[in-house]
Amino acid sequence: MQLELSKEMNLPMIVHSRDAFSDTLDCIKNVGWNRGIIHCYSYGIEEARAFLDLGWYIAFGGGTTYTKKSKMEQMLELLKFVPKDRLLCETDAPYLAPVPHRGESNTPVLISHVYDFISSARGISVEELNETVDKNIKTLFAI
């Protein structure tokens, strides 16, 4: 229903999908609306590929900064895999505060930690990442 409304109104949809990849992908495909954000992304590269192939953006927040050591290599690969023109950063405030504030209430001011982590993983400057995300938001929301 919400995907259909988003499509009718020609607005991007923001989807939080946790442990429901197949169901989420099926809903998106069934409605045929390919303008949105997979918020608080928590899947792997293959799942990202499926969303990206449909035209969706992938958004990373504070949880990205405290990936388990055993999964850090996979996270770094994922952060490099997402194309520049589909990458977004977010706070998810008041939840999922980034390291070094994990366990505290999250606020937008802490987004710098997310930008530091992602720019380091991608081998780019924070300024370049900021420009990328700014451009992507403007494109997605047609502003």
Model-identified regions with their sequence ranges:
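Alpha-helix initiation/capping motif
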Residues: C40, P100-T107, R122, V126
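Mid-to-C-terminal alpha-helical segments outside catalytic/metal-binding sites
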Residues: L5, L110-I143
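Conserved short-loop catalytic and cofactor-binding motifs
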Residues: P12, G63, V99-R102, F117
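Active-site micro-motifs of SAM-dependent methyltransferase domains
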Residues: I58, Y95, T139
